[in-house]
């Protein structure tokens, strides 16, 4: 009946087509509800018939009279329509709906007719009463969305004798969260049909909009192909891991208390925005009390590889290192150091792992390459993720999902090769290598580091060119980094042993420069 109709004054369809034939109160005239409904339906059918005829004229006539504002094609003048936001979302005029003052925008009959069916692919997004639809160049994906969240949703409402409205039963939060949740839900329901689509590389864009009379809103959310490929690969690798990642990062359960729901919704919004942007998410998924990795390590490892572009060799190194930390006798102390360390202390902590024999100098260089100044924070997050997941598996009696990637030795680049050459000369030529290394480790200022290198030159262990390479003028960042590479070589190959409390770190002045770079 009219009370449960999709269109009409104050009905759901008015959000898309305000004041259209079905939503204009003046068209709902009559003595009975049926007469009102018949009058509005007649107005709509007449408009639809007119647009269908003009759409046919676009295809049948060869005249190129005007350019359609929507599709950009040249169409016959007789097949054009004047449209404002009452029948074409987000179109604006001088005033809302008064023809005498607002001529609107010229569009062809094909576009006018096509937009009539937009509600069949439109859904509710977030909690701000905004709408959205998914645009994809893959017909199979677009058709699946329209069928599941359009036709089938409306059929269920009609069968249940409920008022028609757009689909919005998302157990998530935020607009980006709704978009990613949709892709997860589709993949979970139609894995065989959609895996190939997700990995096809065709772009998908979600358009979030509102068409309110007081002002329109539109936002394009571009879904990265890498994110879709990651979801498809994760679902193939493990359905359980896919579900853990989906529910652990995107789901907001309905049984949460109000304060819990608010906190969870904020987390989901932040995570989904980062996923859409292809940013680091593992750090946000770590909880320390109790230690836990939301989403599971298998999903995060694949996300790091597919979306973040982290090399599988690097992930294998970090996984092995994280397990070494978690399984050590000093695990609690080492984890606390990782959690509480300032950014400038992370290089020193990783050098400590080289001294323990858990990392080689090549691996240290591979994890912290030159010109990757912000990677240390993500390295710390990944290590903690491995530690927390390993501890969780031990408590639950489960097997840790280790990487199957075989260890591969990469050939050193010019910088690492130069460090190795200098390190060998120091190892062979310095009379007291351990003392010299201790001085280099404890140096807190650039001048002191240069002084330690000059001592090596004085003893003939290295030459002037080596000194210039290790301590470049006006580039203190490079000097600190090269110092760490050299120490890693000496700890690894030179087997220099220092007391456990001797940790290299940046000096106070240099810290400020590096952190604000």
What are the functions of these language-model segments?
Residues 154-507, 511:
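Intrinsically disordered, low-complexity regulatory regions
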Residues 1-4:
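Long, acidic/serine-threonine-rich intrinsically disordered regions with weak helical/coil propensity
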Residues 6-167:
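Basic, glycine-/proline-tolerant helical and adjacent loop/strand elements
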Residues 514-515:
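Short, intrinsically disordered, charge-balanced linker/junction segments flanking boundaries
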């Amino acid at each position: 009946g009219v009370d449960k109709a999709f269109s009409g004054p104050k009905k759901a369809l008015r959000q898309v087509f305000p004041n259209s034939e079905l939503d204009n109160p003046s068209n709902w005239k009559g003595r009975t509800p049926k007469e009102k409904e018949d009058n509005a339906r007649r107005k709509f059918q007449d408009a639809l018939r007119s647009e269908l005829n003009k759409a046919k004229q676009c295809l049948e006539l060869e005249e190129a009279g005007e350019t359609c504002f929507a599709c950009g094609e040249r169409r016959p003048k007789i097949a054009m329509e004047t449209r404002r936001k009452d029948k074409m979302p987000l179109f604006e005029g001088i005033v809302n709906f008064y023809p005498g003052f607002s001529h609107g925008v010229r569009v062809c009959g094909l576009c006018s007719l096509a937009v009539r069916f937009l509600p069949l692919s439109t859904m509710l997004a977030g909690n701000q009463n905004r709408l959205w639809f998914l645009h994809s160049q893959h017909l199979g994906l677009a058709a699946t969305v329209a069928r599941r969240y359009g036709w089938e949703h409306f059929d269920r409402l009609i069968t249940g004798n409920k008022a028609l409205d757009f689909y919005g039963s998302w157990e998530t939060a935020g607009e980006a969260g709704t978009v990613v949740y949709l892709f997860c839900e589709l993949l979970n329901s139609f894995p065989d049909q959609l895996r190939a689509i997700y990995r096809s590389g065709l772009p998908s864009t979600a358009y979030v909009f509102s068409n309110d009379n007081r002002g329109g809103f539109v936002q394009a959310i571009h879904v990265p192909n890498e994110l879709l490929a990651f979801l498809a690969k994760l679902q193939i690798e493990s359905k359980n891991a896919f579900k853990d990642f989906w529910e652990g990062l995107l789901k907001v359960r309905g049984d949460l208390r109000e304060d819990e729901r608010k906190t969870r919704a904020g987390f989901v919004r932040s995570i989904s925005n980062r996923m859409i942007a292809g940013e680091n998410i593992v750090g946000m998924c770590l909880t320390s009390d109790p230690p836990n990795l939301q989403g599971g390590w298998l999903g995060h490892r694949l996300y790091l590889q597919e979306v973040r572009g982290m090399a599988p060799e690097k992930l294998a190194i970090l996984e092995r290192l994280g397990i070494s930390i978690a399984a050590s006798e000093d695990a609690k102390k080492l984890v606390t150091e990782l959690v509480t360390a300032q950014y400038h202390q992370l290089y020193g902590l990783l050098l400590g792992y080289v001294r323990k024999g858990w990392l080689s100098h090549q691996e240290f260089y591979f994890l912290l390459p030159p010109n990757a100044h912000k990677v240390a924070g993500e390295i710390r997050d990944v290590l903690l993720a491995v530690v927390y997941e390993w501890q969780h598996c031990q408590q639950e009696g489960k097997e840790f999902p280790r990487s199957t990637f075989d260890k591969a030795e990469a050939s050193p680049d010019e910088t690492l090769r130069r460090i190795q050459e200098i390190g060998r000369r120091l190892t062979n030529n310095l009379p007291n290598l351990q003392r010299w290394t201790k001085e280099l480790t404890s140096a807190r200022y650039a001048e002191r580091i240069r002084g330690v290198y000059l001592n090596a030159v004085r003893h003939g262990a290295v030459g002037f060119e080596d000194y210039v390479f290790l301590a470049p003028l006006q580039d203190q960042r490079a000097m600190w980094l090269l110092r760490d590479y050299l120490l890693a070589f000496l700890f690894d190959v030179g087997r220099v042993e220092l007391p456990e409390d001797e940790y290299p770190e940046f000096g106070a002045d240099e810290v400020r420069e590096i952190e604000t770079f």
